[in-house]
Amino acid sequence: MAKVVKFPIQPPEKFGFRRVRKKREAPAKRSSQLNLFTGGKVIKLHQLSAFDEALLLDENNDKSAKEHYLKAIEEGDSVADAYCNLGIIESKLRSYPKAIDCFTLSLKEDPRHFESHYNLANLYAEINNLPLAKVHYQTSIVLEPDFPNSYFNLGLTLAMNQEVDAAINTLLEYRRLASDDEHKQVDELIEYLTRAVR
């Protein structure tokens, strides 16, 4: 008899930005064959692409990451990803117009860039532009329907926008996708919203 091992799921970062971690790779030539050599590599900093170097600096909260992302954009290296991560940096600095510009430039490069839609939605929610937050959360759900944070954040946005029935349905979808640890929190929120409707 086989034993199912459940791996721990990291709690979602609700209303938090989602940095692009690595460049998107082209699909493998043979999708039925596993790549056995995707593990760790020892690399030297000067061997990194401009985007990877910027990401490494960004993940270590190095202020020079911003300049390195701009260098990656100039070199044409992961342009959409670089603009997206620049948008996060600008958001953290509360430079909201610059952040919006970065996210939209990312979407100009790749209109289906999930992280840019998700992060733009978080930014619009933060500055209380709920209609635009709603649209970008909905778009992020279309692009990645299994990412639970989009549902949770959309549910909160709908609730703040007085769309309680839609908020409850969206939070129920979040509950379906979320780990068991998250159920209590979302159940309490759903119960509160249900009572508010009555």
Question: Model-found features: residue ranges?
Answer:
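Structural marker of alpha-solenoid helical repeat scaffolds
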Residues: 75, 109, 143, 177-178
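Long, contiguous interaction/recruitment modules in multidomain scaffold/adaptor proteins
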Residues: 1-48
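Helix-start (N-cap) detector for alpha-helical repeat units in TPR-like alpha-solenoids
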Residues: 47, 80-81, 114-115, 148-149, ...
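TPR/TPR-like alpha-solenoid helical repeat scaffolds
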Residues: 156-160, 181-198
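Alpha-helical segment of the N-proximal tetratricopeptide repeat
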Residues: 43-81, 88-92
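Structural signature of tandem alpha-helical TPR/SEL1-like repeats
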Residues: 59-71, 92-105, 126-139, 161-173, ...
